[in-house]
Amino acid sequence: VKFNKELVQLVANKFEVSKDDAYSYCVLFFRTESGINNLIDICKQYGKSEKEIEGLMENE
């Protein structure tokens, strides 16, 4: 799974971890609805709008 680079960077900043670790965190977050909600909350904490969050949450 490929995640949006900005989303991975936000997770890295939030948890003060490397981008590689942040990628692993994203894998775990996307496994559950509550995890996805946590990612949305992280995006909101960094001032992202609903539209920006939708774009960030799209993965390839």
Spans of features found by a protein language model:
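Amphipathic protein-protein interaction modules
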Residues: 1-33
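Long, compositionally biased
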Residues: 34-60
